């Protein structure tokens, strides 16, 4: 069953954006996260936080990816906070437009 991940990283938004850009470029240069089960990926910012919002094939796949040492190392090597510091919410996906 598909799920939606919402991960909130608190901090200086300008610094988080720059670190996100570096980390995202590195992840994409390695083939992205579709092989890990990510179907869609979005990044948004708000007052004092950066959000990563993704649609994943299953809760198990997102938890496996976000708990992996390799993923943590990629993020932190680019100056992005460890996924362990994120406030994470995983929700059952009810609907998506356009459909998956």
Label for each model-derived stretch:
Residues 1-51, 55-69, 81-100:
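Short S/T/G/P-rich N-terminal loop/turn motif that feeds into the first structured element of a domain
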Residues 72-78:
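Low-complexity, intrinsically disordered Gly/Pro/Thr-rich segments
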């Amino acid at each position: 069953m598909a799920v939606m991940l919402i991960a909130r990283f608190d901090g200086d938004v300008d610094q988080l954006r720059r670190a996100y850009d570096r980390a995202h470029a590195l992840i994409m240069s390695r083939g992205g996260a579709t092989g890990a089960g990510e179907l869609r990926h979005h990044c948004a910012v708000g007052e004092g936080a950066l959000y990563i919002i993704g649609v994943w094939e299953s809760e198990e796949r997102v938890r496996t990816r976000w708990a992996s040492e390799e993923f943590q190392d990629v993020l932190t090597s680019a100056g992005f906070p460890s996924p362990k510091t994120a406030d994470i919410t995983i929700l059952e996906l009810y609907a998506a437009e356009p459909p998956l």
